[in-house]
Amino acid sequence: VESNHLGGICLNWGCIPTKALLKNADVFDIINNANKFGIEVGEVTINWSKIIKRSRDVAKRLSKGIEFLMKKNKIDYIPAQGRLIGKGNVETTDSNGKKALASANNIIIATGARPKWFSGIKPDGKQVITYKEAMILDKQPKSLVIIGAGAIGVEFAHFFQTFGTEVTLIEALPNILPIEDNDISVELEKIFKKRKMNILTNTKVTKIEKLKTKIKVHFQGDEIVEAEKVLIALGV
């Protein structure tokens, strides 16, 4: 039973499509540094819509592959929402509101994850976004504040900054990638700073102020950072 696309968050909106975006960034970086290898190239331009489309196509293709494997292995796939209604029983509701009953001796709940945000600071999908909107932006932002420097935050920081977005990365704990080994965190911070990324650690956001064409991010000490968009990447 699955109400969205087969493969869940990781395949459709997480690990897989973000790695496709990072591959685009790596190729762009290699081309821009080709002269170091004795290869001369002309002016390099990007097609943002194609960059985004490639990532989405990768996710769609793999999700379709899972659907094929379900059929091949004779696994019943019910595209619907499921709700436990008693021992061994799941009520399903499809997109048209049609209900049905599925029964089994054993039931596994594997419902995935959802974005986390501050109390009182909720994403609007336009100026204040989550990882999902960040993967399908129709236009590259000129500037971006990323709140949270875990795996999700640093991946998007690398991706957007490589393509020229001015990135500010904010983390409440002493290091970026706070749950990784300290030597990894320190080394990555050096790399990001060498690339002129603005990194603020030990920094807690107190307020997000939305204006017409920009956002002001307030943090302790009455400090403010302005950007076109804010990406909330808390938790992971």
Feature roles, as predicted:
Residues I107, E228-I232:
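AMP-binding/adenylate-forming core of the ANL superfamily
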Residues D138-E180:
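Rossmann-like NAD(P)H-binding beta-loop-alpha module
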Residues N198-L200:
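Conserved SAM-binding strand-loop segment of SAM-dependent methyltransferases
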Residues T111-G112, T203, L234-G235:
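Conserved NAD(P)H cofactor-binding loop of Rossmann-fold oxidoreductase domains
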Residues E2-Q140, T168, L173-L177, D183-V186, ...:
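Glycine-rich flavin
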Residues Q81-R83, G150, T203-K204:
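Conserved acidic residues
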Residues V1-S3, I147-G148:
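The Walker A (P-loop) glycine that initiates the GxxxxGKT/S ATP-binding motif of P-loop NTPases
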